[in-house]
A protein has these predicted regions:
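Acidic-leg catalytic submotif of subtilisin-like serine proteases
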Residues: 21-33
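Conserved SGNH/GDSL esterase-like catalytic core that processes O-acyl groups on lipids
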Residues: 44-142, 221
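Residues at the starts of beta-strands that form the adenosine-phosphate
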Residues: 21, 78, 174-176
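Catalytic nucleophile serine of serine hydrolases
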Residues: 28, 41-44
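Bacterial Sec-dependent N-terminal signal peptides
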Residues: 3-18
Length: 240
């Protein structure tokens, strides 16, 4: 888990610095070719990747992604970006497609993959950045359900997000889980109802929820400036 190194603090060079391993559970916002489409052991997966494909945005190198910048801070190191472009928290994709049991569902990406490698590694921190595609695909919110989830429940967002957080806390008991919400004003973020749902579910599980503001985007996706803003806003919370 976390490692203790010599301090990088010029005001107190003898103070120890604890380096925490960070895993990202995300969608297109957290992808990058050659990073998010391989697992912890380097095995290729079938994840879709948004960045840095030509013409998407000016995020043309991995060091321009929010998560890479965050993990360059002295107190963090990247465990893995377990991120699949287009993925949904629930088991319902665009046009009502059922993605139960596939890596297009966040819920499936907990524990071991088909190679026997843990999707999220051995993290100290897990940053869950999802819900955008559920909202854009108009997945039904459903009811607040905190146990005994049915297949029908998990095709709706609220029960699925609840199960995701519960599963992460159970499977990675030594990790701290945070949620990142893509705004609360609608496209190119999530709607107020989605944002409120995420916040309510986070409160139930004692998960800190980071609601992003003023993220520069092109075609609904963060630019380099947007990535910098995400990094800064997330660091303000997890870097405390």
């Amino acid at each position: 888990m976390a490692m203790t190194l010599l301090s990088c603090n010029p005001d107190d060079p003898d103070a120890p610095t604890t380096v925490k391993k960070v895993s990202i559970m995300g969608d297109s916002y957290s992808t990058f070719e050659g990073w998010s489409n391989v697992d912890m052991a380097g095995n290729p997966n079938d994840y879709y990747v948004y960045y840095p494909h030509e013409g998407n945005t000016d995020v043309t190198s991995v060091d321009k992604t929010w998560w890479y910048m965050l993990c360059q801070k002295p107190e963090f190191e990247l465990e893995i970006s377990n991120s699949n472009s287009g993925s949904v928290v629930s088991n319902t994709h665009y046009n009502g497609l059922d993605v139960t049991g596939t890596d297009l569902s966040f819920m499936h990406r907990v524990g071991k993959n088909s190679f026997g490698v843990d999707y999220n590694g051995d993290p100290d921190i897990i940053l869950v950045f999802g819900g955008t595609n559920d909202c854009w695909a108009r997945v039904e919110l459903g009811n607040y359900v905190y146990k005994n989830w049915t297949d029908a429940d998990l095709k709706c967002f609220r029960p699925a997000f609840s199960k995701l957080l519960a599963s992460l806390q159970a499977y990675y008991p030594d990790a701290t889980v945070y949620s990142i919400t893509n705004g609360d004003e609608g496209f190119p973020g999530v709607s107020k109802s989605y944002a409120k749902s995420i916040n309510n579910i986070c409160k139930h599980y004692g998960v800190t929820n980071i609601v992003l503001e003023d993220i520069e985007k092109v075609d609904g996706h963060p630019t380099y400036a947007g990535m910098q803003s995400i990094c800064e806003q997330v660091y303000e919370v997890v870097g405390e």
